[in-house]
């Protein structure tokens, strides 16, 4: 299954004009089936949206404001780091947020959020029926009347205390989750590969047509430091083609330190891998960004093993990893280290503890870049204004 997922991902990220010259016969044999599925996907999307527009499917309204964080394409767009960033904005303002997430893929993202937000009043509700999950949390903790809490000072330095009651809901991967009404739609775009091959799933990476950008209230271009000025301009042009007035912000996933597998309470500075022999192992949506960031830290050599997004490491995978580490040790006459992301570690931490090699976990956090007149404060102001527009009339 993992091999099939990798094949489909390679097709989805390859321009059709290059298929014949770059893809293997096995890849090419899948294209007719994927094309058929993709042609059926669009009318299914339209039909579903039409059911909501006609009221045949009901859109549920929560008693608190809802911030949706989603994307137009799958994989590596920084949704979960942005969810955490927004949650911290509200926590710092004294408003306990409720994060609503599906929790698929071994719940690696849920575990990471739980660790990062531990000790804060943020709550994490997990399940496909996020309206029902939210209802359970509202009954358990209560909620704050938004007209009394989300005023102009909410995201400023003058904090208010709301106890344990929920003041806002943050919808993780919410763009296609039409069941919940939202106050603000934040759309994440991966600057390194923004639109894949411009085709719909499963032949491409698009979960909706480009016209869906019209629904965006805010667009965040993630991994913005890894794209050229021309690439950033091309992304801006595409976004503004469908949504002329939408504000665009830029973010990065900034590394802070490493933790050691087997002793995660011990942190290591980033400089610890300078001049080291490394094997980067990941099962995330944007492995290239991970490897490039490791390269910037100055190791002597970087090798990589990529698995499909959310892949759970099995014993056979550990054997492959161990053999690659043995080879690196033989080639360089030095003991290599393995580096993984937090998502990979939290998916199955126990399988990484007995490799016989040191395993480091790269810890990072999302930051809004000061770029093109936008920065973290202007993003918070934009968020605040949208919540005021929709809830405080």
Where are the regions a protein language model picked out?
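C-terminal accessory "lid"/substrate-recognition subdomains
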Residues: 1-26, 194-335, 389-393
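A transmembrane-helix-recognition feature enriched in membrane-embedded lipid enzymes
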Residues: 3-65, 374, 386-391
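Residue-level signal for inorganic ion chemistry
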Residues: 40, 80, 113, 172, ...
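Walker A (P-loop) phosphate-binding motif
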Residues: 49-105, 225-226, 393
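Short helix-loop-beta junction
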Residues: 92, 115-120, 294-302
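Phosphate/Mg2+-binding loops and adjacent switch elements
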Residues: 102-250
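Short, flexible loop segments at boundaries between secondary-structure elements
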Residues: 254-256, 308-312, 355-389
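Acidic beta-strand-to-loop metal/phosphate-binding motif
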Residues: 335-343
């Amino acid at each position: 299954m993992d091999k099939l997922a990798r094949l489909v991902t390679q097709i989805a990220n390859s321009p059709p004009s290059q298929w014949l010259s770059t893809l293997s016969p096995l890849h090419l044999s899948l294209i007719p089936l994927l094309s058929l599925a993709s042609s059926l996907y669009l009318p299914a999307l339209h039909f579903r949206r039409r059911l909501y527009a006609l009221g045949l499917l009901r859109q549920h309204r929560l008693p608190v404001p809802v911030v949706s964080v989603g994307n137009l394409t799958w994989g590596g767009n920084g949704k979960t780091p942005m969810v955490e960033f927004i949650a911290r904005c509200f926590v710092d303002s004294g408003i306990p947020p409720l994060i609503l997430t599906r929790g698929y893929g071994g719940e690696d993202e849920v575990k990471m959020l739980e660790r990062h937000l531990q000790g804060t009043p943020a709550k994490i509700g997990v399940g496909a029926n996020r309206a029902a999950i939210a209802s359970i949390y509202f009954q358990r903790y209560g909620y704050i009347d938004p007209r009394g809490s989300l005023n102009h000072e909410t995201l400023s330095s003058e904090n208010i205390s709301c106890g344990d009651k929920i003041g806002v809901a943050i919808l993780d991967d919410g763009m296609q989750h039409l069941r919940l009404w939202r106050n603000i739609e934040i759309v994440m775009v991966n600057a390194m590969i923004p639109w894949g091959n411009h085709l719909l799933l499963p032949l491409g990476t698009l979960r909706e047509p480009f016209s869906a950008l019209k629904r965006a209230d805010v667009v965040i271009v993630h991994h913005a430091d890894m794209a050229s000025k021309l690439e950033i301009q091309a992304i801006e042009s595409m976004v503004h083609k469908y949504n002329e007035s939408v504000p665009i912000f830029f973010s990065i996933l900034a590394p802070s330190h490493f933790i050691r597998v087997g002793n995660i309470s011990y942190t290591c500075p980033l400089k610890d891998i300078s001049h080291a022999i490394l094997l980067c192992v990941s099962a995330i949506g944007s492995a290239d960004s991970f490897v490039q960031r490791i390269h910037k830290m100055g190791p002597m050599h970087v090798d990589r093993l990529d698995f499909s997004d959310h892949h759970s490491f099995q014993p056979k995978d550990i054997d492959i990893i161990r053999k690659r580490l043995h080879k690196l040790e033989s080639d360089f006459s030095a003991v290599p280290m393995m580096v993984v992301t937090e998502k990979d570690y939290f998916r199955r931490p126990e399988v990484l503890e007995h490799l016989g090699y040191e395993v480091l976990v790269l810890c990072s956090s999302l930051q809004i870049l000061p770029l093109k007149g936008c920065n973290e404060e202007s993003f918070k102001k934009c968020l605040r204004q949208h919540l005021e527009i929709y809830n405080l009339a």
